[in-house]
């Protein structure tokens, strides 16, 4: 079963503009109820094109700890919904502490805790 925090290889093509594409690792960020019942899954792209977080929506993951080819970065500003058929193989899963970092970066990316601009 697909679980939140799992890292899979996924085929992200076709893409447009600045979207991450090709076959690459992604982390599952959708909740486990959705993962169980939905034909789709919400993921964040992972890149090895940079190995250090550049902005607050980036989370670093170490190649040795997570069995990746290179030190990589989860791009929480690059989230998308995929059909589960795009998932190829499970590579690893993220630790609870790493998922807390992912959640914090998602909060920033989606502005989940920033409702000041909605007040009248």
UniProtKB/Swiss-Prot annotation:
One of its GO terms (molecular function) is RNA endonuclease activity. Its EC number is 3.1.-.-. The keyword RNA-binding applies. The keyword NADP does not apply. Keywords: Endonuclease, Hydrolase, Nuclease, RNA-binding, Toxin-antitoxin system. SUPFAM superfamilies: Cell growth inhibitor/plasmid maintenance toxic component. It comes from the Bacteria. InterPro entries: PemK-like, Plasmid_toxin/cell-grow_inhib. It is an enzyme of class 3 (hydrolase). Forms a complex with MazE which is no longer active as an endoribonuclease. Belongs to the PemK/MazF family. Toxic component of a type II toxin-antitoxin (TA) system. Ribosome-independent, sequence-specific endoribonuclease that cleaves mRNA, thus inhibiting protein synthesis and inducing bacterial stasis. It cuts between the first and nucleotides of 5'-UACAU-3' in single-stranded RNA. Neutralized by coexpression with cognate antitoxin MazE. This is Endoribonuclease MazF. It comes from Staphylococcus epidermidis.
